[in-house]
Amino acid sequence: MNNEKQTIKIASADPSALGLFGLAMVTLVASSQKLGITTGLSFVIPWAVFLGAFAQLFACINDSKHENTFGTTAFGGYAFFWMAVATSWLFKMGVFGKQLAVVDDKQLAFAFLGYLIFSVFMTIGAMETHKVLFVIFVLIDFLFIGLTLSTFGIAEHATHQLAAYSELGIAIFSFYGSAASVLNKHFGRVFLPVGKPFGIFKK
């Protein structure tokens, strides 16, 4: 009797580039609205759903196949964030009726606070990935600080501006991170540097 065990390994590509591209696109479009360059949310919602949510969820699922807990948690956490935010916008716009359009913005502020906590400990993890990702997470921290405070009505104009410019910064660095992930792998060398891990917590 043959007792040999066979292991089948299914290889899949690194999904980080697509996940970061999704993040870059949704934050670029959303920041344009926060900065007052564009108005309304109707054309922000599709990008929130398909790029912010679905693209990052795809990256989350595929990172889990790579046994990448950090990537799975990061992409999954923010994918569900954009799903929830897009749904919240639809409620507020009255898509589901006038009664559901009557909302308490402070509930959303508490959600932003929860995501601020999430982002802070994920920032610690990003320190041991690479420096571009660390910068993205620091900007995400500032985004959620701004969103939390402005939604609570604390120094509303200043904190809204903090959120807006932080979100634009996230878009810029995420485009770079996505490009680096694609091109470095494609060319088999460091085409766009992303910086080494800090080496503080993980030796």
Region annotations inferred by a language model:
Residues 40-52, 100-114, 137, 165-168:
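Structural signature of hydrophobic alpha-helical transmembrane segments
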Residues 22-29, 46-58, 72-90, 109-121:
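Core segments of alpha-helical transmembrane spans in multipass integral membrane proteins
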Residues 109-121, 131-152, 159-180:
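Alpha-helical membrane segments in multi-pass integral membrane proteins
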Residues 188-203:
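Short, highly charged, low-complexity non-transmembrane loops/tails of multi-pass membrane proteins
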Residues 3-12, 31-42, 68-71, 92-104, ...:
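Short juxtamembrane and helix-loop transition motifs at transmembrane-helix boundaries
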Residues 1-59, 63, 198-201:
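N-terminal topogenic module of multi-pass integral membrane proteins
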Residues 69-78, 133-138:
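Cytoplasmic-side transmembrane-helix entry/capping segments in multi-pass membrane proteins
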Residues 56-66, 120-128:
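C-terminal ends of transmembrane helices
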